[in-house]
Amino acid sequence: MSSNMSAEATRLLKKIEADKVKFIRLQFTDIQGQPKNVSIPAVQAEKALSEGIWFDGSSIEGFARIEESDMLLKPDPATYSLLPWRTGDAKVARFICDVQTYGNKPFEGDPRFVLRKTLADAAKMGFTFNTGPELEFFLFKMLDSMPTTQFKDQGAYFDLAPTDSAEDVRRDVVLALSEMGFEIEASHHEVAESQHEIDFKYGDALTTADRVITFKFATKSIALQYGLHATFMAKPIAGINGSGMHTHGSLAKNGKNAFYDPNGEMELSDTALYYIGGLLRHAKAITRVANPTINSYKRLVPGYEAPCYISWSVTNRSALIRVPAARGNSTRAEFRSPDPMCNPYLTFACMLAAGLDGIKNKIMPPESTNTNIYHLDPKARKKLKIDMLPGSLAESNAYLLKDEVLCNTLGDHVVENLTRITEMETDSFRLAVHPWELDRYLATY
């Protein structure tokens, strides 16, 4: 063991040996939020912790061009964990990594770095940012090792076995995540058939973003052991509820919830109201990151409990931002538009940047809306000055490009690649011939 190793690295090497780990996965995410990894034998752990592991960034979506592709994975010691579902003698552990370039400089296209940078901006203002996402997902049957959209069960909201036949899958996911350090608060069947939700305790935004990636990775891996496909696709089936990732956010200052004011209107502080005002002002641009695919916009339509109108409320779940009833240290704002296809690092960074802009510029939100917005006609919405979220990926990207605050938050590299991905996805979708078109036109014409 090298004498130059830090005390933390030395402790981890002893832990890896004690855990009898044979392989280590060095994980990171691309701009789209897809988890990537390099697997190394445990004997390479010392090198990984002290020097990092080089890889080819040109092969990763949105990372680097081939002529400047050498990149370094630096494991974050705080993210060490065994993968509980990998049983047997060949135990596997993982680290989540930061991505660097030559000279140990942070790579500006690393989503984790984008969030770290934004959290540092908040810290300069005295704030820490906590988030608590609620991830919904579907469990579908597999056929010939390929995922289908055939339901595993016919359960509904809060149903139990035998109607909820995927209870065992959720149980094993909960047990695995608990072993990985999650504090699980609840698990249940969701509204749609074969749709589920597992909730874990909120935490600082970086830890929570790491956990979102881990949650999806673990859920998919364990579902596969049951011969099922877990999908976090926003709208896999038309005509039923899609999957969301409602995200609760709050700021703390000097260890106290900065959103709570017992003497404020609705017991909300000016900080809370400014944060909400900032989120509302930047909502259209945030949508490009929080709803990152063509499919995402098929969820953001009226009638399926997904927000599509830019408004806020204390109780109203048809609003984009809802302030739950709890006060004191639990005071928070729930941002309801994100879906679980999003990159959590970029989404949390944009939420925070928008909120901080609201605080800096004292952006007061409009009056809260306590009416079911889905039941209002366009004239009534116009009178209340309630605008709509973008209706497509291309539209939301156009709003992002006009939003100086969020473009500065994400950085040129990320914005340019999000735009490139938008154009590529939009063209691909536009040129494809869809089953709907065949059903509609083939026999008639």
Predicted regions and their residues:
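Glycine-rich, acidic/polar active-site loops that bind/position phosphate-bearing ligands
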Residues: 2-445
